[in-house]
């Protein structure tokens, strides 16, 4: 099984460690994409690039694709274009959290990420169990500048979600933050979901079960069907 992760460079080994022995995870950077996604504008930029990427990846023989952003930019559109699973970390993280507790909280990078994250939960149908979304207050590109300080801040925000919002589970709402999940879980004593790991495991489950998204939900755009039909004549 081959899964392509489209996101920031330098994550190949860590992502591969999350996968099973029969799975190969290939990490690639989307050419022309933003260095980080911290606004709706940047989500739209990433979404447009994802469309071309997924078609090429399916032709290349990949079994599943994971866009490397918690906001799941472009996932719905990409599913219309291909038949292989396209799994967003946001969806995978929220779904996993709902299996582990009655209410879950999300730690987002910045204040500006809170509303889009809440909207994402509504879009995926996981808003009923969402206890709250709180910002870490650290930009994505600065999260690794002081790992100890970032972990301390993560623990503080997570505890506020647990104590004030009654969250039973914490989801790390950023791909860069996701690699701190095990440390944070040890520090705060509740399950902490790494959305990238959850996405890889969900891809493995779907592919090994010969399942993918329904084309009744995500049909090929009619204009593209018409073009393909003309080309086949």
Predicted feature residues:
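N-terminal glycine-rich anion-binding loop in soluble enzyme alpha/beta folds
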Residues: 1-48, 109-147
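C-terminal and late-domain segments of enzyme folds
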Residues: 4, 173-179, 191-220, 224
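Glycine-rich, highly charged phosphate/nucleotide-binding loops
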Residues: 39-56, 149-157
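Beta-alpha junction/loop-to-helix N-cap segments that form part of ligand/metal-binding clefts
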Residues: 50-77, 81, 174-178
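Non-catalytic positions within long, well-ordered alpha-helices that form the structural scaffold/packing
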Residues: 58-61, 122, 162-163
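Hydrophobic alpha-helical
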Residues: 67, 71-74, 155-187, 200
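Short, acidic/small-residue loops that bind anionic groups at enzyme active sites
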Residues: 79-100, 184-203
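Short, glycine-/small-residue-rich phosphate/pyrophosphate-handling segment
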Residues: 98-136, 152, 205-233
């Amino acid at each position: 099984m081959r899964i392509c992760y489209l996101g920031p460079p330098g994550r190949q080994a860590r992502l591969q460690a999350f996968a099973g022995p029969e799975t190969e995870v290939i990490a690639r950077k989307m050419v022309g994409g933003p260095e980080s996604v911290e606004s709706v504008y940047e989500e739209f930029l990433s979404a447009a690039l994802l469309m071309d990427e997924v078609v090429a990846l399916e032709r290349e023989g990949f079994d599943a694709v994971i866009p490397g952003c918690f906001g799941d930019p472009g996932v719905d559109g990409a599913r219309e274009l291909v038949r292989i699973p396209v799994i967003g970390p946001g969806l995978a993280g929220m779904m996993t959290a709902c299996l582990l507790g009655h209410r879950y909280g999300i730690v987002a990078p910045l204040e500006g990420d809170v509303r889009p994250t809440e909207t994402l939960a509504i879009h995926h149908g996981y808003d009923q169990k969402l206890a709250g979304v709180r910002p870490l207050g650290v930009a994505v590109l600065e999260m690794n500048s002081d790992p100890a300080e970032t972990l301390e801040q993560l623990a503080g925000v997570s505890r506020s979600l647990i104590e004030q919002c009654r969250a039973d589970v914490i989801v790390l709402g950023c791909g860069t933050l996701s690699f701190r999940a095990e440390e944070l879980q040890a520090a705060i004593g509740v399950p902490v979901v790494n959305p990238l790991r959850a996405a890889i495991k969900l891809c493995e489950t779907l592919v090994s079960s010969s399942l993918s998204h329904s084309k009744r939900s995500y049909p090929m755009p009619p204009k593209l069907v018409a073009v393909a039909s003309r080309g086949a004549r």
